């Protein structure tokens, strides 16, 4: 008889609490549905695990793990690893799960540690869902202030140093069982100790503040993942950040947002809606517009959410907001409606002289470049701005012009800049410009800088090469 890949062997009910049986059965069915829904492996990380299932883990293996590390695994996680799987499958490093998949049971336990998992897995977990940034920094900074000393295991010279670093890791990441990798320095882990035991937390090895998943246990978190694969929510051009935001339907979240006065809950609801797959249904956009008209403290964020799905519906609200908050409006247009940059060129030209915010100026120049083929004359005055960051952006923008060589006098002025960061941007902007009038100024720069301050010399070197010179030759 052929074994169905997605037909796990369910252990007798007496081996785990009966409350999990129905949910495990749903998960069993949804694994097959998820694989079918994502047959082209479009969900981020799915091409790595391919919805593979390892054989279920035996009770003896679970007990041996708990004894080795001195921990008690959450009941629902125990039920999962002992139930969900393909008894005839090969055991691989990962199996079906969020991002790059779930680690095979009992593996990668040191992912958040230098070593010493026998000590650290049973250590008290110091993390909490409501931890502030200040609390996180107070916990993590003192323990990793010398983290560069431990980047390479071969650099650890003494047993004392190893033990100290293990202790530091244990204080920050103690009580966490790594479940899988999200790529780069991000992981999801199962809390084993403390008041939040059983919860899933997203952690970052570069010490960004941890983010707890909203589900209160492993099975709910895993089933939510399968639901989002099946619904297509995770099949998206955008990075979906599963497990970081509330997963209920957008309609449910907006309804809760309307009927609660708790600010954190309101923020969580809108963040959840923001990360839904686009475009949102027209009825949801109607509700968002209604909320915008209430002019509450979330108005700007609601306009952003609307902008993601419908530029035409968002446009009147963007027009109302642009004079007061050009930075936000220019960002929204650039991020969500680049095809409509030309609509905003007159507004940008009108507001640009009064913009002092550096980020707002950056986004204004993006809209100009995209929406106006003759943006250069608008940008020229800002090469003399008192703010060096504004000057940098002005030269960078001018460097994107197809008519750069018509503005050689402006670039020559820039090559005499006192601010090295601005100067570097001017040099970069002259890529492939080989006019001999530039050479005397390039030589002056070569003599002026003995060291590669802000990569001046690194960028100057290929410019001099246009004229057959090296840095040393230019200094003569």
Tell me the role of every PLM-derived stretch.
Residues 23-26, 30, 272, 287, ...:
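Charge-rich, solvent-exposed alpha-helical interaction surfaces
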Residues 247-257, 279-292, 311-323, 342-353, ...:
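Amphipathic alpha-helical scaffolding segments comprising HEAT/armadillo-like alpha-solenoid repeats
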Residues 136-252:
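Long, contiguous interaction/recruitment modules in multidomain scaffold/adaptor proteins
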């Amino acid at each position: 008889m052929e074994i169905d890949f997605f037909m796990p062997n369910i252990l007798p009910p007496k081996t785990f609490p009966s409350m999990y049986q129905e949910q495990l059965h749903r998960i069993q069915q949804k694994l097959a549905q998820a694989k079918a829904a994502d047959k082209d492996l479009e969900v981020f990380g799915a091409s790595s695990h391919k919805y593979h299932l390892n054989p279920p883990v035996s009770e003896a293996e679970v007990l041996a793990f708990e004894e080795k590390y001195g921990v008690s695994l959450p009941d629902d996680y125990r039920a999962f690893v002992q139930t969900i799987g393909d008894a005839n499958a090969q055991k691989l490093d990962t199996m079906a799960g969020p991002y790059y998949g779930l680690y095979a049971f009992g593996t990668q336990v040191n992912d958040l540690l230098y070593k010493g998992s026998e000590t650290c897995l049973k250590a008290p977990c110091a993390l909490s869902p409501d931890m502030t940034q200040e609390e996180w920094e107070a916990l993590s900074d003192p323990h990793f202030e010398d983290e560069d000393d431990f980047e390479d295991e071969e650099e650890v010279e003494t047993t004392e140093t190893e033990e100290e670093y293990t202790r530091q890791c244990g204080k920050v990441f103690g009580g966490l069982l790594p479940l899988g990798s999200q790529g780069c320095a991000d992981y999801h882990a199962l809390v084993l100790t403390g008041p939040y035991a059983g919860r899933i937390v997203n952690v970052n090895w570069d010490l960004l503040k941890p983010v707890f998943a909203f589900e209160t246990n492993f099975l709910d978190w895993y089933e939510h993942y399968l639901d989002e694969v099946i619904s297509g929510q995770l099949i998206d051009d955008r990075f979906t950040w599963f497990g970081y935001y509330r997963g209920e339907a957008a309609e449910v979240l907006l309804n809760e947002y309307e009927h609660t006065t708790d600010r954190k809950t309101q923020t969580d609801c809108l963040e959840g809606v923001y990360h839904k797959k686009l475009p949102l249904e027209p009825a949801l956009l109607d509700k968002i517009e209604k909320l915008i008209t209430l002019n509450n403290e979330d108005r700007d964020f609601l306009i952003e959410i609307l902008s993601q799905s419908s530029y035409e519906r968002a446009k009147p609200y963007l027009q109302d907001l642009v004079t007061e908050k050009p930075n936000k409006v220019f960002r929204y247009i650039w991020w969500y409606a680049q095809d409509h940059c030309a609509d905003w060129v007159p507004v940008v030209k009108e507001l640009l002289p009064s913009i002092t915010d550096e980020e707002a100026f950056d986004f204004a120049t993006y809209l100009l470049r995209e929406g106006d083929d003759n943006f250069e004359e608008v940008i020229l005055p800002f090469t003399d701005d008192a703010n060096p960051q504004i000057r940098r952006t002005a030269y960078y923008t001018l460097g994107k012009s197809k008519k750069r060589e018509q503005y050689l006098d402006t670039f020559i002025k820039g090559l005499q800049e006192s601010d090295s960061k601005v100067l570097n941007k001017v040099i970069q902007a002259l890529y492939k410009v080989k006019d001999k009038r530039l050479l005397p100024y390039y030589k002056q720069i070569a003599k002026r800088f003995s060291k590669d301050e802000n990569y001046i010399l690194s960028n100057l070197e290929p410019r001099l090469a246009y004229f057959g010179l090296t840095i040393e030759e230019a200094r003569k």
